[in-house]
Design a protein with these regions (language model features):
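A transmembrane-helix-recognition feature enriched in membrane-embedded lipid enzymes
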Residues: 2-50, 99-108
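Soluble catalytic domains of membrane acyltransferases
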Residues: 23, 43-161
Length: 161
């Protein structure tokens, strides 16, 4: 991929390893800053990290997380990044309405999903990422669950498994 004249769709469908080196380097610096910030703010840790960071070469994984706040996205994304895994988060397409957010999410390898529909474009992009050996992050509830008493409903994501 070239550095300029790329659309977000080019990044949604391209292997992370083919992203321009400047983009990958920028992502690494931003991840470092976010890792330090999130560790200082929330003092999180990954339990059973060896299970999460263990991977089979050439085979992608679907990482499924509960979504209780926006903070866990930082924790999960940075922990996996510094554990040697390049994760492709699936994000709601409403975020892509902002050009800056759309640009940023596409450069970290995010894949937009049109919620409430059978978004085959998203599923195909995630499927191709998995076939290339990349990892996909999904929050299957489709939204944040504010209370631990409420049992989360699973709206999507299991088509990838």
């Amino acid at each position: 991929m070239r550095l300029f004249k790329q659309t977000p769709e080019d990044y949604y469908n391209a292997p992370y390893a083919e992203f321009p080196a400047v983009i990958r380097g920028t992502v690494a610096v931003v991840m470092g800053i976010l890792w330090v910030f999130s560790k200082l703010m929330w003092r999180w840790k990954v339990e059973d990290a060896d299970l999460l960071f263990e991977r089979q070469e050439g085979r992608g994984s679907v990482v499924i997380c509960n979504h209780t706040s926006m903070a866990e996205l930082l924790a999960v994304e940075t922990a996996l990044f510094f554990g040697g895994r390049r994760i492709r988060p699936i994000f709601k397409s409403e975020f892509a309405k902002s050009k800056i957010v759309r640009w940023a999410f596409s450069r970290v390898g995010g894949i937009p999903v049109e919620r409430g529909t059978a978004d085959m474009k998203c599923l195909r992009a995630a499927q191709h990422a998995l076939q290339r050996g990349e990892d996909v992050l999904i929050f299957p509830e489709g939204t944040r669950i504010r209370s631990r008493e409420i049992k989360p409903e699973v709206h999507g994501g299991f088509a990838l498994i």
